[in-house]
Amino acid sequence: MQIQLLAVGTKMPTWVTEGFNEYKKRFPADCKLVLHEIAAQKRTRKADLNRVMQQEGKSLLQAIPKGNRIVTLEVKGQAWDTPKLAQQLEKWQMDGRDVTLLIGGPEGLSDECLAAAEQRWSLSKLTLPHPVVRLIVAESLYRAWSLNNNHPYHRE
């Protein structure tokens, strides 16, 4: 199975890239974590932010491989603790499909992205910076994988 983190925004700070890559390399070949970045639309003072969000949403949806399970990351999604995320990861693996996790831009995800989602995941009720979300997702998924595989990384 492959877990694709599909995120709006490029040119992340070095610490974000290094942190994500550290977790990415820990995953085994049968549960790969990959990052695919979509360029953010330009935001000016007079920009129609709804239109910007729609354009970013269209780009996100076009980048999803056919047949993938789509999971959006959003404040209004379902909160999963580590054991629940581990259960979700196990279900995804048993399903046999690859998974795409969507992270929107500063305004969030378009209605089309939300409608395409099979699941909605909330990391927190807090508003989190998008670079930090990438790290939290990568670490949380690795922790869930380690729990499912009796790896000593996760401790209760």
Swiss-Prot record:
One GO term of the cellular component aspect? Answer: cytoplasm
Keywords, sorted A to Z: Cytoplasm, Methyltransferase, rRNA processing, S-adenosyl-L-methionine, Transferase
- Give the disulfide map: none
Q: Which InterPro entries match?
A: Alpha/beta_knot_MTases (IPR029028), RlmH-like (IPR003742), tRNA_m1G_MTases_N (IPR029026)
What domain of life does the UniProt record list for this protein's source? Bacteria
Q: Where does this protein hold S-adenosyl-L-methionine?
A: 73, 104, 123-128
Q: Give yes or no: UniProt keyword Repeat.
A: no
- Write out the catalysed reaction: pseudouridine(1915) in 23S rRNA + S-adenosyl-L-methionine = N(3)-methylpseudouridine(1915) in 23S rRNA + S-adenosyl-L-homocysteine + H(+)
Q: Where in the cell does this protein reside?
A: Cytoplasm
> For this protein, what is any one GO molecular function term?
rRNA (pseudouridine-N3-)-methyltransferase activity
Pfam families registered for this protein in UniProt: SPOUT_MTase
Q: What is its EC number?
A: 2.1.1.177
Query: Main localization of the protein?
Result: cytoplasm
Q: Please indicate if the UniProt record lists Transcription as a keyword.
A: no
NCBIfam families documented for this protein: PRK00103.1-1, PRK00103.1-4, tRNA_RlmH_YbeA
Q: Which PANTHER family match?
A: METHYLTRANSFERASE (PTHR33603), RIBOSOMAL RNA LARGE SUBUNIT METHYLTRANSFERASE H (PTHR33603:SF1)
Q: What family does the Swiss-Prot or TrEMBL record give for this protein?
A: Belongs to the RNA methyltransferase RlmH family.
Q: What does this protein do?
A: Specifically methylates the pseudouridine at position 1915 (m3Psi1915) in 23S rRNA.
Q: How does it assemble?
A: Homodimer.
Quote the protein name from its UniProt record.
Ribosomal RNA large subunit methyltransferase H
